[in-house]
Design a protein with these regions (language model features):
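Active-site core of bacterial EAL-family cyclic-dinucleotide phosphodiesterase domains
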Residues: 131-168
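Conserved long alpha-helical elements within nucleotide-processing catalytic cores of c-di-GMP signaling
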Residues: 1, 7-34, 43-47, 57-65, ...
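Short helix/loop segment flanking the catalytic signature motif in cyclic-nucleotide metabolism enzymes
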Residues: 49-69, 77, 96-102
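Catalytic/regulatory signature loops of cyclic-dinucleotide turnover enzymes
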Residues: 79, 103-126, 142-153
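Output-coupling edge of small sensory domains
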Residues: 73, 89-91, 157-159
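A short linear hydrophobic-aromatic micro-motif
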Residues: 39-41, 155-156
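Catalytic core regions of nucleotide second-messenger enzymes
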Residues: 40-46, 71-88
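Flexible, glycine/charge-rich interdomain/linker segments that couple
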Residues: 85, 94, 113-138, 155
Length: 168
């Protein structure tokens, strides 16, 4: 199981605090996650994201609750108290993804959905979201292949209204 913690609007904090202080904040978050989860379970996967590997669903649930609880309080860097908003995405292997590329694509899809929900949100992948992502991915692949092979044809199918007796 994978937990991805995305720090919402971290670029604002980086702009306000500067590179040195924002790096210190990331270091503190990384150390907290390392202490909580252990070696080889925490990865800084992007400038504003961490990924935590959990061995079991129970461990994943426990970590999710503890991380959410910690992010409800402020982080302190150079006497600055910083409230961080985060979006957490939970994905289960092999039900939600089977390959690393699918994991990353699904993660981005879920983070996009989490961003629409507000701050301190946890989105857990389910069968519906997984199917939605896979449908979207099939369309993206089909469109990319059609463009690459110059075989992209668009058909206009007019709709005739029987009530109005005209094309609408």
């Amino acid at each position: 199981d994978r937990l991805t913690i995305h720090l919402s609007k971290f670029y604002h904090i980086h702009t306000i605090l500067g590179t040195e202080n924002s790096n210190e904040l990331l270091r503190e978050i990384g150390e907290y996650l390392y202490d909580l989860c252990g070696k080889f379970h925490v990865f800084h996967t992007a400038g504003d994201a961490f990924t935590v590997f959990a061995d079991t669903k129970e461990q994943c649930e426990r970590l999710k609750c503890e991380i959410q609880k910690r992010f409800e309080s402020d982080w302190v860097v150079q006497e600055n108290r910083i409230a961080l908003d985060m979006e957490t995405v939970v994905q289960h292997y092999p039900t939600d993804f089977k390959a690393i590329a699918e994991y990353y694509g699904m993660r981005e899809f879920l983070l996009e959905n989490a961003g629409k929900s507000g701050a301190q949100v946890i989105v857990e992948a389910d069968a519906d979201m997984t199917a939605q992502y896979r449908r979207r991915r099939k369309v993206e692949i089909a469109v990319a292949r059609a463009i690459r092979e110059k075989g992209f044809l668009v058909y206009y199918q007019p709709v005739y209204s029987l009530k109005e007796k005209q094309i609408v």
